[in-house]
């Protein structure tokens, strides 16, 4: 919860969402979250010594092992997540586009998220720079939080 709250309030994250808000309204934050996931996956080796493929499989196995305690929302999403290997597909713009389309198909309102990968391509350097700044700040905040636990 700390990370979600921190992310939503961060000025750089908000700057990224403002770029999309007029077209995607309240879905802008969800979209930027996925864009940032893309940059994390793309640059995974910068942030982790563990191979992304190994991390992904470990994560999926953890979901399977702890299925009984997962939220209903997570349980509902889990088959799509694993079957389409969402975490690994975050590495590519095409993978993000597929995920956005799948999410768009499942929204009740007309979100048009399926089209937002166009903005990812159009503003790629800007989003990547914003992610890099944001993620550095997030790592520092998490480190501070961990020291106080």
What residues fall within each predicted segment?
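N-terminal leader/auxiliary helical segments
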Residues: 1-149
